[in-house]
Amino acid sequence: MTDHTPLQPKHEITDQADQDTSAEMLVEEEDKKEIGPNYITEEEAQEIRLRALAEMENFKKRLQKDHDEQIRYAIDNLLTDMLPVLDSLDLAIQYGSNDDACKDILMGVSMTRKLFLDTLKQYGVTVLGEINEPFNPELHEAIAHEEREDIPEGHVSTLHQRGYQLYERLLRPAKVSVSSNKNNSNTNK
């Protein structure tokens, strides 16, 4: 038998095994000291899990809301580009109403305008700006003040250009003149 390992006394082997075991125990104790306070309880783990699930659910809802809003307002730019066409129809009706020769054409333009407005309404567009309605700076753009006895102060006295709104989003404010009473103007001067 040729064994190249040197022979060691038995007591040396057990001393070395004891040293290895005690070294492992020291390392485990060190690990426990480092990791021990960082352990979480089952209740804490459940709470963390529930919070993560709630955050994920809120994130999904935000994504869905953003997606729905993008779809809802996808026609925003198209509608804004179409508003001058509607303005032209309004002007044709306004100026054609004074000429009897344009009566038949005026009827066709009026029908086209109504059809156009009905279609816009189906897509969530509302028309803004009526004479005698209260002035609202969020929906109206005041371009002048007029002294008017027949319209209450702070109300729309003249409509220069209609405004339009897509659901809650303003496409264009109505351009209006706002009434002011003659009596109030003189007392303020």
UniProtKB/Swiss-Prot annotation:
Cystine residue pairs: none
Domain of life: Bacteria
One GO BP annotation of this record: protein folding
Record GO terms (molecular function): adenyl-nucleotide exchange factor activity; protein homodimerization activity; protein-folding chaperone binding; unfolded protein binding
The keyword Acyltransferase is assigned to this record: no
Keywords: Chaperone, Cytoplasm, Stress response
Disordered: region residues: 1-23
Compositionally biased intervals (Basic and acidic residues): 1-14
Subcellular localization, as worded in the UniProt entry: Cytoplasm
InterPro entries hit by this protein: GrpE (IPR000740), GrpE_coiled_coil (IPR013805), GrpE_head (IPR009012)
Subunit text: Homodimer.
UniProt protein name: Protein GrpE
Species name: Lawsonia intracellularis (strain PHE/MN1-00)
Taxon lineage: Bacteria, Pseudomonadati, Thermodesulfobacteriota, Desulfovibrionia, Desulfovibrionales
